[in-house]
Curated annotation (Swiss-Prot):
Gene3D superfamilies per UniProt: Anticodon-binding domain of a subclass of class I aminoacyl-tRNA synthetases (1.20.120.640), HUPs (3.40.50.620)
Residue sites binding Zn(2+) per the record: C28, C211, H236, E240
Amino acids binding ATP: K271
GO terms under cellular component: cytosol
Sequence motif: 'HIGH' region, positions: 30-40
Keywords, ordered alphabetically: Aminoacyl-tRNA synthetase, ATP-binding, Cytoplasm, Ligase, Metal-binding, Nucleotide-binding, Protein biosynthesis, Zinc
Cofactor(s) listed: Zn(2+)
Protein name as annotated: Cysteine--tRNA ligase
Length: 447
């Protein structure tokens, strides 16, 4: 039985899907104006792991993750680069797909783009105006937060607490608002900006409305799980809830999940702080699976500190698991012990996808395998566990000449011609093939 920590209720709740054996997930994707950094990748890897575990347990998962390709940051970056916003966003969408593929992130069921949903966004905003949840002001359209019952309950804040923080704002946009907390659903276009015609003049969507529209258009008025980074809890997800539930009158998402930050020297990694490392740059020197394994070692809600040592440890641990998979199969293994490993793994992951405890079980099982318990069922169970973490090793294929050398060495050993056997071992070692002579035969692995 899977239990999820729901940010809305601040409690662990049993997962009950809207549709039996199906999970509908919407995870906020990147604003595509630059390469993603390791902190951004944490969200992609965390929710991919969650998706994979749902699939491991037999669920069909509809996994939707958007690309925000209309945004102030994109417009600014495109202007600086001398290209159109679409050219810039296309470039970094391609980079995101390439980077996350290297991290073993499965393709989403759909990756909607804001530019493809402009008509639906306009219709959504019109509906909110008709219901008196929104108003037009000088070409902009704002959402009335005071009309939203329990506004900001996701962030565990009251409207009065938020109003105190907003009371000192004096910018031009705030002057148009009925309440400083009201947020933009539609922004009037400035000269030279990308824009679309609407009942309120040329403009473009506000950030928050985009996800509400894409999520409900694809998955319906109520979805099982909405996820994203902890920094999206307020205001982004808070505003999504307000506008979505105002339009439909229904609960927007039954479970809210937020992943923790990647930190550097225990400070959040971010572009604004200038302490970030892009995945694109990291992949020049670090294998994608190593980076993935590092990100998966901590339970998704907890922060994870990025250090060279942590990456080095991930590399060593991954190599150990790979070598474990290359053990020669044995004829027998304790079936009850195998069953206990599987149960322990599921207990760990059922507890709010506790990957830290799940990986501990994996290493305990690897130790058991290395002690001589490695039948085909054991191998299958072990590979399925690793796949939950996105760790999938391709079968090593030995070239014909290497296979022949191993066979020739075995023949020499059988004939007690140890000089030839040792020479062949040295020859294989020079090609990166390490041989281990065990009671069950020759075990090999690549250095």
């Amino acid at each position: 039985m899977i239990k999820i920590y729901d940010t809305m209720t601040r409690s662990l709740r049993k997962f009950v899907p809207l549709t039996e054996n199906t999970v509908n997930m919407y995870v906020c994707g990147p604003t595509v104006y630059n390469y993603i950094h390791i902190g951004n990748a944490r969200s992609a890897v965390a929710f991919d792991t969650i998706r994979r575990y749902f699939e491991y347990t037999g669920y069909q998962v509809n996994y939707i993750s958007n690309f925000t390709d209309v945004d102030d940051k994109i417009i600014k970056a495109a202007t600086q680069a001398g290209v159109s916003p679409k050219e810039l966003s296309d470039r970094f969408i391609a980079a995101f797909i390439e980077d996350t593929k290297a991290l073993g992130v499965k393709p989403a069921t759909q990756n909607p783009r804001v530019m493809d949903y402009i008509a639906e966004i306009i219709s959504f905003v019109e509906s909110l105006i008709e219901k008196d949840f929104a108003y037009e002001a000088d070409g902009d359209v704002y959402f009335r937060v005071e009309k939203s019952e329990h506004y900001a309950k996701l962030a565990n804040k009251t409207l009065s607490e938020l109003e105190v923080g907003a009371s000192g704002r004096t910018d031009a946009e705030t002057a148009l608002k009925e309440n400083p907390l009201d947020f933009a659903l539609w922004k009037s276009a400035k000269a030279g900006e990308v824009s679309w015609d609407s009942p309120w003049g040329f403009g473009r969507p506000g950030w928050h409305i985009e996800c509400s529209v894409m999520a409900t258009e694809i998955l319906g008025d109520t979805i099982d799980i909405h996820g994203g980074g902890a920094d999206l809890e307020f205001p982004h997800h808070t505003n999504e809830i307000a506008q979505s539930e105002a339009k439909t009158g229904k609960t927007f998402a039954n479970y809210w999940m937020h992943n923790g930050f990647v930190t550097v020297d225990n400070e959040k990694m971010s572009k604004s702080l200038g302490n970030f490392v892009t995945v694109h740059d990291m992949l020049q020197t670090v294998d994608g699976q190593v980076l993935r394994f590092f990100l998966a070692t901590q339970q998704y809600r907890k922060p994870i500190n990025f250090t060279e040592k942590a990456i080095h440890d991930a590399e060593i641990n991954l190599k150990y698991l790979k070598n474990t998979l290359q053990q020669p199969l044995t004829e027998t293994a304790d079936e009850q012990e195998l069953k206990q490993f599987v149960i322990a793994f599921q207990d760990a992951m059922d507890d709010d996808f506790n990957t830290a405890n799940g990986i501990t079980v994996v290493f305990d099982m690897a130790k058991w395998i290395n002690s001589g318990s490695y039948t085909e069922p054991v191998k299958s169970a072990f590979e399925k566990m690793l796949a939950v973490f996105g760790i999938i090793f391709e079968e090593e294929v030995l070239e014909v000449d290497i296979e022949a050398l191993i066979a020739k060495r075995q023949e020499a050993r059988a004939n007690r011609d140890f000089a030839i056997a040792d020479a062949i071992r040295d020859q294989l070692a020079a090609q990166g093939i390490k041989l281990l002579d065990t009671k069950d035969g020759v075990r090999w692995l690549r250095d």
